[in-house]
Amino acid sequence: MARLHGLQIRLRPGTVPKTSAVAVITGILLSTTFAAVLATADPPDVLDARYVIEPVTNATDVVTPVGCTHDHRGRLLVIESHTHQRPEGYAGPPHDRIRLVEDTDGDGRADRFRTFHEGTRFTMGIRLGSGDWIYVATRAEVFRIRDSDGDDVADQREQLLRLDTAGDYPHNGLGGLAFAADGTLRVGLGENLGASYTLVAADGSSWAGEGEGGSVFRCSPTGTELSRVATGFWNPFGLAFDPAGRLFTVDNDPDARPPCRLIDVVATGDYGYRFRYGRSGRHPLQCWDGELSGTLPMAAGTGEAPCNVVPYDGGLWVTSWGHNRLEVFTPVVDGATCRATSRIVVQGDHEFRPVDAAPAPDGSLLITDWVDRSYPVHGRGRLWRLRLAQGPPRTGAEGWPPLSAGEQRARRLADDAAPADRSAALRDADPFIRQAAVAGIVAAHAPLPAWERIDDGREKLGVLLARRWQDDVDRYGRLPGGGKTESLATADRDTLLAAALADADERVASFAVRWIADERITGLRPGLERLLAADATPTQLLPAVLAALDWLNQDSADPRRYDRAALQRRLEAIWTDATRPPRVRLAALRMTSDVPKGKPLSALAAIASGPAGGDEPLAGEAVRLLAAKPTADVAVTLEEIAANAALPAARRADAVAGLTRLPQGEARLATLLADAAPEVAATARELAPGNAAPATSPAASTDRGPRPAAHDTAAWTARLGAGGDPEAGWRLFFGGRRARCAECHAVGGRGAAVGPELSGIARRMGRSRVLESLLQPAREVGPAFQPYAVTLTDGRVVNGISVATNDRDRTERFLTADGTEVTVPLAEIEHRVPLATSIMPAGLEQGLSDDDLRNLLALLEQ
């Protein structure tokens, strides 16, 4: 079933030949419909008066466009996708095409369209190389093509890189392409959903991996001498060099760790993400902004779903598919790297979906527009031209910051075989200087200083970084022809890691913990156990140690087969053990996501009910675990805690929040409505079942005047301002039926998994963005949370988010809006249609006071 602005076409799978009458009629209908759509479509808003944006094509001239570039004659080449999640009954060509787009009469509109190349699948990127070679990336290969006889059809093809993997998701394989000044090629590889892979170059050099996340690779323009440049990405979908030779990428975000990132990519850099530890990005062994030892921070956060980064007119232009806009980032030197400040130059509506951009010979910027928010190809598309209203754009180095003294030093450290200041550089406060020294050690195969002679924690960390990169090259890299480099002794590696685990510097021990977990070095489990038991172990290191031990104890390294029940049992054994240090028990309890049963539940209830003056952080965490997922088994415990005036008010109020979600909650809370502790009484009143708490209720004590319309995010942001009580926000998030947040979302690892995990989201994205999502839930639905109406063969319809296939791909699981999981046999699915609305209900703010909203935002800033 295709649904096109009211036009519905039902096609039975396998019954429509490529040249059938149905296909012809369908094409005519689509062309007519889409031409009408374009005629009424408004161009996106240009927020900077220096620029103008104009349409280049009609709706069906080039459809579902992805990448674009200009050939050696200045003509536009555009990837036209026909395979990206191709829907049932799709009437387009069977393969992707590269279209040659020309304006032959000079009126600014394209009027000539020819196919330069076709036959590819999941085609992602395209860039002009040297001479007349055009470089193309699909998810499975990088190749180059050219037209040798002048007929405007590519007739020469050379494969440069091949990705051998079972992974087949359209856009998390190979993608981004960029050429350095010396002609060498950089290629981005996405997280590949953790599937094992081998990237093989034309000369037989290769790199293998599994579960580490995305990486950036380097090879010659002919596909030789493959090497890894940097790692720790989710999906470095777009790559570009600025005029000073800095390499930037835009990186899509994990499910629960926005924002997406603009990153200054440096040799041997690790940017923190590991797919093996899950999609959320919140695992203790993952980070997103350089929080973990040995990782590097982002240059800036970007809009949702950035697809490419393009240098133009003195700035880095980023196409934000998810937020319907073009952002311009201005690099600002910060030591040996660049941060960036941003501004929105073009903002469109929900039908502006920019993917790629290419500076044209005439000084304009050509932009591809996917148009629709749906991932499957849909037969629509646009090309836009952005130009300066007056004069030409800045070119060359004009407008770009020159390399700072720190950046120049970093390049020398990375390139020189034996710089005199390498040891000092490893001790430098700037992580990018230290990383450059590491890159130099790796490139020169330089010997490492003796561990016992190093007295500086940063230098020790640098030695570990270099040793690990060398170890990765030995284990996962292959030389031209397939030969291995000389292997470093595993025994030496493990001896070094054992010493690092015992080091007094937390940064050193933290890096060792992560390395041991990443490589599943089970022989060093005793060292992790000693670290967990030691009184001197820093509290902030404990979650990583616990997570590493859990990973070593897993039967499989495949994150798709992760045994979460076994993790919960191991954590229970720690937090129920009164002989362990309280801070270790607290760390384990915070990592516990589910209320246990049987004997562990009794132990949890005893901790939660502990007397005042005891270990309050542990007791408070126990109450919150019980309250976040209350069941009939814990009702009595929560009632006793809530009613016990001898306990701290905060603990009692959290128990009240849990009681409000239980049956007969109103009766349970009746005696607490006038409790002597204001915090308890207020929570009971505000969260009691049946209390809708409209904006005019007494709870809304600071509300003032008429409320803005839901679409006026700026007015709402100004109205609510800053502040708020995060403790009250937690109780609202998990308690009662007014906000209903915990039915779909989680905070701090507690809650449901229907929607994204929200811990710290307002701190990272800003209050306005979070408010917009709450006020207008259907404005932008992340692709991972796209709901579908699934019609079954018996006529039933299931509305929900697809979670996974099971039973050897014979069934599919869906999560519905109320958190219910429904399993459906795949053979019984007749068709599915993406819903235009979110499963998050609209109008939630109508049942919340201004104080409620402030408190929720304060919680989400933590």
Question: What are these regions, as identified by a protein language model?
Answer:
Residues M1-S20:
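N-terminal secretory signal peptides that target proteins for export/translocation
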Residues G6, G14, G27, G481-G482:
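Residue-identity detector for glycine
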Residues G6, L11, A35-P43:
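Basic/polar N-terminal segments that are highly enriched at the extreme N-terminus
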Residues Q8, V24-G27, A606:
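Generic short N-terminal amphipathic or hydrophobic helices
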Residues V22-A36:
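Bacterial N-terminal signal peptides
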Residues V37-Q408, P825-A827, R832-L835, I839-Q846, ...:
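Beta-propeller domains with acidic blade repeats across secreted/periplasmic ectodomains
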Residues T40-L47, I53, D270-P297, G301, ...:
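Extracellular/periplasmic ectodomains of large secreted or surface enzymes and adhesion receptors
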